[in-house]
Amino acid sequence: MLYWALVFLVVAIIAGALGFGGIAGASAGIAQILFYIFLILLVVSLLFGLFRRAR
């Protein structure tokens, strides 16, 4: 998932450099959403790992 966030970020940077503002904004938004989902899943995974060790 982090890979796809980076892909959309690169697409946004390239589109922004070429003057495609709408595509750049959409790609940056998708990258941001995927990154936040990745962070949430990371935190949930860490919490589950800590709870399993506590038992």
Swiss-Prot record:
It comes from the Bacteria. Disulfide bonds: none annotated. It is found in: Cell membrane. Pfam families: DUF1328. It is a multi-pass membrane protein. The chain crosses the membrane at residues 4-24, 30-50. GO terms for cellular component: plasma membrane. InterPro entries: DUF1328. Keywords: Cell membrane, Membrane, Transmembrane, Transmembrane helix. Belongs to the UPF0391 family. This is UPF0391 membrane protein Meso_3110.
